[in-house]
Amino acid sequence: MASFDYDVLVVGSGFGGSVTALRLTEKGYRVGVIEAGRRFDTSTLPKTSWDLRRFLWAPGLGMRGIQRITPLKDIAILSGAGVGGGSLVYANTLYEPLEPFYTDKQWGHITDWKAELAPYYDQAKRMLGVNEVPADTPPDKYMHELADRMGVSDTYHRTPVGVWFGKAGQRVEDPYFGGEGPDRVGCTHCGSCMVGCRIGAKNTLDRNYLYRLLKKHGFDD
């Protein structure tokens, strides 16, 4: 009988891959994760999007950065490349769907989806450290004013994001997993989330799901 090194092989270490790998490992499966991109830390992430070798993913041109761009006929797909996948380059926004999503006529009759999915959204929010941006930025101000003028001021709210908003620039021991996770540094509001957080405030997947895989479950790197 053939023997295998892994029970499950997960392709990609983005949101889908990292969550799948951790949960299957917790259930006792032997899991391998394949990632095309490399591992980054705060010192190796690009300082700007003009640092093409560190920012763009185009191995044929010697670029092994975090941003992959896949052009198709009518659209271009932006995705992440590196350990942590899209979490390295997304804007941290983590919204829960509005009511119409849960009650859509195509599936709303099957079950109470809002109640069904609530525990999983709560779990994901805990893992990703979701909280609202604590300070109003100029765009917040303009959006709020626009909502007022349109008579829908109740629809404005601060953005839910996966960021540690401690004292700006101050390093603290893991505030999310009882000290079992990596240190965090308070967000400085530099606006570089989509280039790669060099501060250490952004809750990318290598700081939660993948971190637990590597540290708690003894994954070989």
What are these regions, as identified by a protein language model?
Residues 1-105, 109-115:
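N-terminal glycine-rich phosphate/pyrophosphate-binding loop and immediately adjacent elements
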Residues 112-220:
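Conserved redox-cofactor binding core of oxidoreductases
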